[in-house]
Amino acid sequence: MAVTGPEIERLIALLSKLPGLGPRSARRAVLQLIKKKETLLGPLAAAMTDAMAKARICSACGNVDTQDPCAICADELRDPHILCIVEEVGDLWALERAGAHKGRYHVLGGVLSALDGVGPDDLNIGRLVERLTGGEVREVVLAMNATVDGQTTAHYITDRISGLGISVSRLAHGVPVGGELDYLDDGTLAAAMKSRRPF
């Protein structure tokens, strides 16, 4: 039984489809939005309308921006010789927040997964190979998550580009900054030992 009008129920149902928001969290979010109708709900609705009208997928790298090519691909100060390959746009944004990469990116749009039926043709791998055969890229940084599917995808890409004469590196795996050894899982500790370097 609905306890409120259909418009509000629809908003709750739509919000609950977002990652990390179930029906209960969506209900709380909607109640907060309605309480702050003028200062939050109205501006949010306007921002969503603007984003819907202006958001674009970059035809070069797969990033989300309001321009195509995106601001990163259009930035002439970026090193065009280093290409960082990520699974999703959120991974690209995380690396940008960290200020850790000064080259360009390529978003795959997921990972290879036999269980989920995701193969190479379902990802942005064909476009990646096109970019790499252009001759400008000298190094590829594989920034996949440290999951079985992430590592499978990294190995697949390495095999696909092996004859192009491009150096391939991957992100280090191991102890996070501020991490305590006693709280880390065995796999992380093993990866940290294998990835150790001189101090």
Swiss-Prot record:
Keyword Hydrolase in annotation: no
Residue span, Toprim domain: 81-176
Protein name: Recombination protein RecR
Zn finger intervals (C4-type): 58-73
SUPFAM superfamilies according to UniProt: Recombination protein RecR
The UniProt record lists the keyword Cell membrane: no
Family under the similarity heading: Belongs to the RecR family.
Domain of life: Bacteria
Keywords: DNA damage, DNA recombination, DNA repair, Metal-binding, Zinc, Zinc-finger
Pfam families for this protein: RecR_C, RecR_HhH, RecR_ZnF, Toprim_4
GO terms of biological process kind: DNA recombination; DNA repair
Functional note: May play a role in DNA repair. It seems to be involved in an RecBC-independent recombinational process of DNA repair. It may act with RecF and RecO.
Molecular-function annotations in GO: DNA binding; zinc ion binding
InterPro entries given in the database record: DNA_Rcmb_RecR (IPR000093), Rcmb_RecR (IPR023627), Rcmb_RecR_Znf (IPR015967), TOPRIM_dom (IPR006171), TOPRIM_RecR (IPR034137)
Originating organism: Parvibaculum lavamentivorans (strain DS-1 / DSM 13023 / NCIMB 13966)
